[in-house]
A protein has these predicted regions:
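HIT superfamily nucleotide-processing domains
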Residues: 1-132
Length: 132
């Protein structure tokens, strides 16, 4: 079981932003920007393009809803969608609020927000997601 599966199962605490029976979204604990969110399928699959077509399509639709909620909760010019997938063997999508392309440079120093900031941000995103 991957760390992301354990997070989605509630075995490891997370800052939950959205969920349904197939997908789970939570804040990255080492974000590039406040609101940096990870979206995962509950189905444990290492490589995103190994997901079956139905799951991949549904993941994108769920991710879109999370991105809309994120943009409402954390005003930004756009929400970037990035798929890297080398650090954790579980398919996942990064959603990053951005003002410019520099905001999605993974080589830059990541933020270390206080737990209260993380929880407030997750709560705002969750509330916006519930409106969709």
């Amino acid at each position: 079981m991957t760390i992301f599966s354990k997070i989605a199962a509630g075995e490891i605490p997370s800052y939950k932003c959205a969920e349904d029976d197939r997908f789970y979204a939570f804040l990255d604990i080492s974000p590039l920007a406040i609101g940096h969110t990870l979206v995962i399928p509950r189905q444990e699959t290492d490589y995103i393009f190994d997901l079956d077509d139905d799951t991949l399509t549904a993941l994108q639709v769920f991710t879109k809803k999370v991105a809309l909620a994120l943009r409402a909760a954390c005003p930004c010019r756009k929400v970037a969608q990035v798929v890297l997938g080398l650090e954790v063997p579980h398919a996942h999508i990064h959603l990053i609020p951005m003002q410019s392309e520099a905001d999605v440079d993974f080589r830059k120093e990541h933020l270390s927000p206080a737990p209260e900031v993380m929880q407030q941000t997750a709560d705002r995103i969750f509330a916006e997601f519930q409106k969709l």
